């Protein structure tokens, strides 16, 4: 299959809520199949917060968060790895295969894609990753396959680390010089009245964070988007998987959801 070289790779980050919505997954994967057939290279990066919560509860464990980031104590690592690199990854792979997408399920630990280290000892086994080698990803993309990547990384000492999926997607977008799209179950960043904000830069984000309009999970998402927008000098989209068909417009250069702008 010959791939078009003029479209940059789209890195789609999806959240755990998608996996609880079969129709949403089906629509997203059907859209992905159309985009890949038209020569668009896609990488999907996923979290799986809801599944992680379910598994922790089933194991009698509780979740603690610090500034919107999950704290990962040693005893929770096997459960979190199983929920993310195992169940969540394979649920998405199943939906992709059903829609006719040839995909490769993997984690951040594969193919020397990233280097990983502990982010902050207060967060336990939470990792921070930086881009390393694009060779493995580029080979998979060159075949017309879609990588589906869980946010589990492995450091140089072999320690498994839980990485925030928004940060994971940011690093993979840098690695392949692609466009980052953060998909969640809301259509983008909403103002205090629930209206979609079409475009934001750093000073506007800081202002909305200070008055409590952007908080918790959306704060982490917007900060990840700002980081990649500024380091790559191009806008990042925050949009909804509920309107997957909009991604085709995005791949044609149109704006959807909220555009996070580099200053």
Swiss-Prot record:
Compartments in which it is found: Cytoplasm
Ranges in coiled-coil conformation: none
Q: Which GO terms describe its cellular component?
A: cytoplasm
Q: Which GO molecular function annotations are given, in alphabetical order?
A: acetylglutamate kinase activity; ATP binding
Please provide the record's keywords in A-Z order. Amino-acid biosynthesis, Arginine biosynthesis, ATP-binding, Cytoplasm, Kinase, Nucleotide-binding, Transferase
| Annotated EC | 2.7.2.8
GO biological processes: arginine biosynthetic process via ornithine; L-arginine biosynthetic process
Q: Site (Transition state stabilizer): which residue positions?
A: 13, 221
In this chain, substrate is annotated as bound at 48-49, 70, 162
Q: Which Gene3D superfamilies match?
A: Acetylglutamate kinase-like (3.40.1160.10)
Q: What is the main EC category here?
A: transferase
Q: Which reaction does it catalyse?
A: N-acetyl-L-glutamate + ATP = N-acetyl-L-glutamyl 5-phosphate + ADP
| Protein's pathway | Amino-acid biosynthesis; L-arginine biosynthesis; N(2)-acetyl-L-ornithine from L-glutamate: step 2/4
SUPFAM superfamilies named in the record: Carbamate kinase-like (SSF53633)
Described function: Catalyzes the ATP-dependent phosphorylation of N-acetyl-L-glutamate.
Protein name in the entry = Acetylglutamate kinase
């Amino acid at each position: 299959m010959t791939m078009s070289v003029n479209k940059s790779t789209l890195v789609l980050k999806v959240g755990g809520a998608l996996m609880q919505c079969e129709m949403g997954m089906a629509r997203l994967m059907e859209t992905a199949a159309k985009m890949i057939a038209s020569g668009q290279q896609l990488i999907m990066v996923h979290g799986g917060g809801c599944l992680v919560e379910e598994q922790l509860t089933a194991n009698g464990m509780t979740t603690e968060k610090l500034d919107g980031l999950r704290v990962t104590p040693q005893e929770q690592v096997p459960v979190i790895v199983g929920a993310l690199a195992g169940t969540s990854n394979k649920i998405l792979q199943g939906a992709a295969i059903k829609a006719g997408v040839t995909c490769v399920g993997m984690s951040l630990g594969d193919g020397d894609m990233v280097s990983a280290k502990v982010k902050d000892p207060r967060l336990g086994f939470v990792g921070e990753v930086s881009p390393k080698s694009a060779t493995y990803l580029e080979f998979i993309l060159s075949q017309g396959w879609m990588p589906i990547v869980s946010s589990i990384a492995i450091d140089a000492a072999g320690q498994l680390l839980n990485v925030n999926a928004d940060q994971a997607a940011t690093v993979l977008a840098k690695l392949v010089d692609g466009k980052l799209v953060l998909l969640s179950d809301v259509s983008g960043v909403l103002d205090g009245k629930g209206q979609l904000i079409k475009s934001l830069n750093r000073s506007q984000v800081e202002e909305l964070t200070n008055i409590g309009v952007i908080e918790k999970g959306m704060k982490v998402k917007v900060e990840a988007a700002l980081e990649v927008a500024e380091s790559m000098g191009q806008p990042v989209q925050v949009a909804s998987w509920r309107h997957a068909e909009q991604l085709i417009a995005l791949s044609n250069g149109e704006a959807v959801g909220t555009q996070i702008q580099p200053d």
